[in-house]
Amino acid sequence: MPRATGNFEVTLNPLDNNPGIEGLGRMSIDKQYHGELEATGQGQMLTGGTTIKNSAGYVAIERVTGSLKGRKGSFILQHNGIMTRGTGSLVITIIPDSGTDQLDGLRGTMSIRIEGGKHFYDLTYTLGTA
């Protein structure tokens, strides 16, 4: 499977929360991807925290618009993250059939790592009808 790698910057901003629902939050996502994916990402994240330190979860939907190895278009990522007392897992999937223009038929997954405060992505994908 082809891969695309690079780094990104992310800005999260709180949005209006559901009044009266303790432990839940909502944020906007704004990203700038660099490397083999040159794009912007915009979306929303829902979070849930617990009274136990470092235990939480989030889901997010993000539209990515730009170019993937020179192919222009957009696609949608679905994030599902969970942290259990500091041990985390994250699954980020390209929503099937969300690719547009030259990214029509894009499918795959993205992983994220943070090193020295900097964010990196690794996108594994296929392109074409399935």
Question: What is each PLM-predicted segment?
Answer:
Residues M1-A130:
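Targeting-peptide/extracellular-domain and disordered-appendage signature
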